[in-house]
């Protein structure tokens, strides 16, 4: 359920709304079943896999939700799965469970009408070695295939061609909302916070769907009714309307973001090492904020000739902490 508070839109859910909940390590902590938790709608960051003319092939930078691949245990492929209908907002004729997703779906929640109009329909292969049927589809939103993440084609998108290889580019964390919905995160120190995410290709048989695990491996898959696997949508977008998108930086081969960081100066607090907040009306406040932004955002040296020399500047959650030499 989406609501607005002080002009900002939030998604409100409680534990009963989650796809999966548990007290085991790696799960979101709910205090009870009924208390609502609020999650702010933010712009989705997309990883660019390929650009062809004005069309960009995009993959969500994080897992955005937790959903079953299919709502019932049965032999299934992408074309008749419930996750395909949920992603695109299809009616009951498009999935084996005859469930209508025209009102509650990912596309309506994630995109405005103008944004949705810029998403192109892609021919999506229903490729499988596990079933005799093959029903390719044309969808705006889809899941990546095993071929796109772990074969020769995968190299074009920045992934290892070896599905059993330890691949930083395939590893993924989730949004906080996705974790609340049920994604199970790795709680070990190494690769902490990574989660599983669905591929559309069947796994060891048609009762399983392939996935990417905590460490970037693509194996035999997970049962299609699993509730703790994350959804990482992919799409092809027309880039000609530049008002609909903005550059968000780059990502390195070790999955480290090099973002264009933005800070709202009106929201920044300034706190010295004695935890004393500096008045926003003072010259000191403006000076130190800009010195901190110069150091952390633009990677510039602090100008030591401006008044006292400052060191140990740190930005955390819209607060700047600092100390003098």
Regions of interest found by a model, annotated:
Residues 1-297, 307, 313-322:
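Collagenous Gly-X-Y triple-helix signature in extracellular proteins
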